[in-house]
Structures are given as C-alpha cells and as structure tokens.
Amino acid sequence: MAPAPSSRFPRTLMLLGSGELGKEVAIAAQRLGCRVIAVDRYAGAPAMAVAHGVEVIPMTDPEALKAVVRRHRPDLVIPEIEALAVDALAELEAEGITVIPTARATAITMNRDRIRDLAAAELGLRTARYAYADSAAGLAAAAAPLGWPVVVKPVMSSSGKGQSVVHGPEDVASAWAAAQEGARGSGTRVIVEEFLRFSLAITLLTVRQWEGPTLFCPPIGHLQERGDYQCSWQPAAMGTAQLQAAQAMARQVTDHLGGAGLFGVEFFLCGPPGSEEVVFSELSPRPHDTGLVTLIGQNLSEFELHVRAVLGLPIPAIRSLGHAASRVVLATETHDHVSYSGVADALVNPDTQLLLFGKPDARPHRRMGVALALGADEAEARRKADGAAACLRVGAG
C-alpha cells in the first residue's frame, strides 16, 4: 500500500490525463490550495486550461512518462485515463512517488481480463459468464457455450471503443475487426461475455480513505450507447437488499486493490422487480463519467471527494441535494475549432447547469459538454437535463 500523504500544504498533484474529469479534479484540488500539473497526449486538453503547469507527452511511452514525473517530483500522481504506460507507474512508486490509488490497482483496473479475473475467480463476485479469445475463430468458439447474443470488448480500451453485441456467427468477423480497431496497445485479446438482460445499470461511487471507513455515494443509474455514457440520474431507485449487496462487493474489491481515492464501481441489476440479482461489471479507480451528476446532486461532488480522500482530508458526510440528472452534449460533425449555440436556451429553467468542457476540436459522438438538472423527482430531473442538452449545437468555430 502506498504511504498516506502528509498534512503539509500546498501539495503538488500531477494528473496523467487531462480531459473533462481531470479538469474538475484540478479545480477541486486548487480550491484546497494545491498546485496542479496537467499531462496529456495533446495540447489544449480541458484540464490544461486550469492547471499551473502543462506537459504534452506520448502517454503510452514509459520513458516519457517516467521522465515527466521525475522532472516535477509531484506529491501525488493521479491517473485520470486508461491509455497509460502503467508498468512505469510501479517503477515510480518504488522510487517513493505516491500513485493514486496504487500502481498495482491502476494496472489491474486498466485491463478487463485482470479486473474480471480478480472479481470472479479470486474474490468470488457474481459477474456475467465470460471467456477470452485471441482470434476471430477463438471468439466464435468462446461465444457458443455462452449462448447468442454475446458482448465483445477488447481487454484494453476506453470510452466503449471496440465494443459490440454479436448476435450470431455471421457477426463474428465484424466484431473482431471492431475490437481490434478500438483496442488500446498492441494486444489483440478480447473478452466475450454473456448478454445480460438487466433492468438497471448503476455506478456506485466508492470512497476509500487512507484512514477511516469506506464511504458510498447514493447509487447512480445510467444509460449507454456505443459503449459510452449518455445520461445518468441520482439516486437510482433500488431495493435495500440490492444496495447493500452492491456496497459489500464494492468494499471487497476496493479493499483488495488498496490505496485511497474514489472508485467508480459498475453493476447490473438482473431479474424480476424486487428480487434482482446484483452483478459486478467493471471498476475505474478514479472519478467516473456517470458521476458528473454529482456536481449538482451532492454536497460534495465526486471530484471533491476524490481530492479529499487522496489528500487525507476529512469527509464528514455525503448528502444528496435531491433528484439529479445529467445528459451529455455530443458533437455530430468534425470541426477543427468549435463554437456553441443555444447556451441561453439551455439555462432558462431553474436548477439547471451546463458544463462545456473546452475541448479544442470536435468529431462525431465526441462528448463536448453535459447538462445537469435537479427536479422534484427522477422523471423531472431527467426531463430538464435532456431538454437543456437538446438546446445545444456544436458548430465550427
């Protein structure tokens, strides 16, 4: 386990990955007097606009990654993306650099095969039935015992890249090709999962502290398209027994991974209403995109919770501020420079907020912002967030 950080302030935090989630982490850290260095593979990443220092490096190059960390010697290294030279983090940790949550946890969770084997085989958590394949023929052979359809994902990818639902043998070749195109790194391996018919997908934001109990945010329901988050709402309605089961599994897996910080732990609820089975899906050792809703729905957002946890600061209470919802704002076209229309229309309703991430360019389906809303109930909150997002248009700058 990495050492707990000291109580000395100000602290220097290095973000490995500087997207919209990293930007909110940077803002939360700066409010506590921290110095932030934002690192990413391209200039103009969202967190770079609010950072004290900026570095642009090939994030999957271990030598470049080690060099930038050694040059700055930050108090904490906080990975915020999955496309990283994760093996370099273990070497840096051995030199006394604190990696959040730990280098080992980061490496395990950035590979679907490692986190799935940990959850299912080692910890005995309920997961979808699964197998691995290293070729199109192997994919077909792995899928047959699971029953069609199956879900195919590269073992290393991010933001839903390379995922597909395979309905039968005729789809295997295209699914294999999509997985190879969307994979991160040089590996070709895919995970083949049974297709779960679930009533609800949730993210349970789980806060592990250096000292003190593991804490949980109210569950977040969410919908995905193309393997990527589209909307979320909090709190998601679920039974007490199901919530307790999810919390127990989240605590078990995060305790095994160790370290401190916020983890986004994903589950499916499957089965008849009132007696659903809770099935572990995935885990991210950092703030989660579905958790953007906490910016309006909680007294402490997931980003504030992450920063407090990694700095060893108190978290007296996590309180819901009411029914909250989010809806992403997507680009529909490619633009080298971007502008937005409809901003005023998006903000006409009370208890509605808009975040535009400041990404320098656009491409179809790229997430450019998010609308947030509070409502009297889940339906109203989701309706307001959907309406606000629908007002936005991403155009050429």
Describe the role of every protein-language-model region.
Residues 244-265, 284-336:
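Active-site "cap" helix and flanking loop/linker of ATP-utilizing ligase/carboxylase catalytic domains
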Residues 1-105, 109-110, 114, 137:
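ATP-binding N-terminal substructure of ATP-dependent carboxylate-amine bond-forming enzymes
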Residues 212-213, 271-277:
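Short, solvent-exposed loop/turn segments that connect beta-strands within catalytic domains
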Residues 276-286:
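A short beta-strand motif that forms the metal-chelation/ATP-contact edge
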Residues 108-203, 207-226, 230-253, 389:
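Active-site nucleotide/adenylate-binding loops and adjacent lid/helix of ATP-dependent enzymes
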Residues 308-397:
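Peripheral (often C-terminal) accessory segments that flank ATP-dependent C-N-forming ligase machineries
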Residues 207-209, 268-272, 357:
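Short beta-strand micro-motifs enriched in acidic
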